[in-house]
A protein has these predicted regions:
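IMPase-like, lithium-sensitive Mg2+-dependent phosphomonoesterase catalytic core
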Residues: 1-139
Length: 139
């Protein structure tokens, strides 16, 4: 199970597009309703991964660190899952501004470790991007 707004696929960086395609090839099903708490509950109950990546066109994220990410990070930590901003654990992330926003990824430990492994070990080179055509999105 994965949860993310596929309507914004063009706003994701290339690595996220590839990871999404990987999930689809592994026959993960998509469940996204656009309500963070409902999506959070769905991931807790059924497993999987939630992704709200950085928006490359708006040059920012949407979800607020203090009001949305940190409270949910405490809950998911207690249930054995993981929540990061794509790099560091949300619980360890220092708040710099009261309305600071953050990319957000959370889910079962297994799915999050798979995502982190993919993110940390994939090196994009120009030929990958130039010669890449998505089988799913055609771009």
């Amino acid at each position: 199970l994965y949860s993310l707004n596929e309507g914004k696929i063009n706003n994701f960086d290339f690595k996220h597009k590839l990871y999404l395609e990987k999930l689809k090839n592994e026959e993960f099903s998509s469940r996204y309703c656009g309500c963070l708490v409902a999506d959070f509950h769905n991931i807790l109950m059924n497993g999987g991964i939630f992704m709200y990546p950085f928006d490359v066109y708006k040059d920012k994220s949407k979800l607020r660190l203090l009001y949305e990410a940190k409270p949910l990070a405490k809950i998911i930590e207690k249930t054995g899952g993981l929540m990061t901003d794509g790099i560091i654990d949300i619980n360890k992330k220092k708040l710099e501004k009261i309305h600071e926003t953050t990319p957000l990824y959370f889910g079962s430990k297994k799915n999050m470790l798979d995502f982190n492994d993919f993110s940390n070990n994939y090196e994009l080179n120009k030929d990958d991007y130039k010669n890449y055509t998505s089988k799913i999105y055609g771009c």
